Amino acid sequence: MAGFSHFSQPPYRDLWEPPRPGGERESTQRLGGQRSGADSTACSRAGTPGAESEAGACWLHPHCSFTPRPRRRGCSDSLRGSRSLSDVARRPLERSRKHRPRSRRLEDAWGETGTKPRPAWQPQTQLPPQRPQPCPHYPLAQGDSPPPCPGGAGTPLSGTFRVEKAQGGDQWAVPLGRHLGRWSPSSVPSERSSVPSQKFKRHSACVCAQKRDSSDQVESLASRDSQPLASSKEMRSPHTQVLKSKLEEVVVSSQDQQIVALVLTRLKKAQRIRELQQQAAKAWEELKRSDQKVQMTLERERRLLLRQSQEQWQEKEQRKTLQSPEQRGLRRDSQRKNVPPGESRWKEQPEDQESPRQEKLEKARAQAEHRKQCQVRRLREQEKMLRNLREQHSLQLQRRLVEACRKRHLHAVEGQKKVQDTNLSSLINYQARKVLMDCQAKAEELLRQLSLEQSFQRSQEIHQGLRKERQRELREKAQKEEEQLQQARWRAGESEEQRKMRKRILVELADEKIRQARSHVHKTTRDKVQHLRELNHLREKNHHILKLKAEKEEKCHIEGIKEAIKKKEQRVQHISQGKDPNFQEFQKLPQASRREERAPPNSSLDQMVLEAQLRACQQNRGY
């Protein structure tokens, strides 16, 4: 039964490793606008400006907050369409892989193209919010979290962001106000952690201060990055506004909040179970100590009674030996008085001869009777003492057996509950991670599309500006050259043909320069597009390799979980069928005691040996 106390340990070490320090601050600063935009959107719809978002996340510690792991690009939403809640348990734990953070890769891509994306938190005209479509294949149950849509856990089939049940009057929906870095393994709750809810309340002030600092950083970045790009005309295009509105409408659904609440209840229940186990262990120790004290007192009383009986017997023997000569003299005198005087003379001689023999016979007879009575009395006392001891031992054994059966049943029930709690908590953790990963993947996909479109618009704008500037310079230069030619013609008096030829040559030179500039601009744009295509191809290839590796790790993890569950079920089945060695030992003890009761006691020494053996068996069973 002691094996059930280890069910709360982590099955795998990856889930409790500390988070990696790099790659979180940069992603927070770049994607901080998403938090502020989502907060403003959720507050405007809920009617309370920022109250629900801070109330929903005030208990999270800054080091224990859920930091979602990004989903790698290249995996279409249609592949997730056939998944359900039963597939969540097959998702692997945190992979120990070394690759560059996604924010660093985006920075490299922006640096190679020579442009950076425009911040997504600039104020734009918002489109009317889309009404969320309920999932047709998963009806909601009372007291349960809403099931995921058919396209995946929190991933719509259209590939766009929607407000997940925020407009439907859901009181648990809060805007996404977390860092969009990699998934932190320290954020996964487990049965092993026994932190009470008061510890989370203690760190609410830290979380609120961190939110205010992050919002200040977002506002400073927005004011700094929006100044040099305020003159852009293509940013007002409808497609860019749609992407921004979708990015700002990212919220965490009620499923995440219910998952967190359920995890907290599981933690409290596990702590309560541990306290009950400690109390039961203390009670068992006290019971063993009291049992030992009772046995010691019984043994002391038995020895005292035995000593008293021996002393009484010795006193009686001494009293009889001292009083026997006097009694014989008195009896002889009484006989002499009763005999007539005539007969006493001729009877004195045979009486004197027979008196020693009679005295010897009487003495032997008295001693035999006394020994017989003492032996009978001793046997009766021993039988009575043995009967009392057997009754006491049988009562103690019955009481202990009933208590042991009750505790064994309680331990078995607690073990089954622990197994169910661990399985449910692992499933909840997988669901929470899946939802958060999908949210981050959507945000990154929208950011990537927005950055690509912004860079393309900026390159087109630069190209058009350069072309206009070049044409203006060429026109001015042609005018100056024409003026110089006219002045030279007037001065030198050249003929009309020479002037026409010179003008034609100048026009051809100007056209040639224009063509060269145009070809150079087309070549640079074509090279940039080709470079972006190669970069996307490499990213897709890397994503495919990582996906294969993740599937392999997922299979290994599922096999490990199945094997652990199978071992636990076998253990519970053995205990329930009575194949446990402790239970067999409990069954053998009453049989041995019954055999000892049927067997007649040979002597007091054999009885003491049997009592010592029985006491040793009881002590071994107690420990």
From Swiss-Prot:
Keyword Coiled coil found: yes
Coiled-coil parts of chain: 266-295, 359-392, 431-501, 534-573
Q: Specify residue ranges for compositional bias: Polar residues.
A: 217-230
**Residues annotated as region Disordered?**
1-241, 314-376, 574-607
Q: What superkingdom heads the lineage?
A: Eukaryota
Give the position of the cross-link Glycyl lysine isopeptide (Lys-Gly) (interchain with G-Cter in SUMO2): K528
| InterPro entries, alphabetized | DUF4659
User: Pfam families recorded for this chain?
Assistant: DUF4659
- Protein's UniProt name: Coiled-coil domain-containing protein 185
According to its UniProt entry, this protein's organism is Homo sapiens
| Taxonomic placement | Eukaryota, Metazoa, Chordata, Craniata, Vertebrata
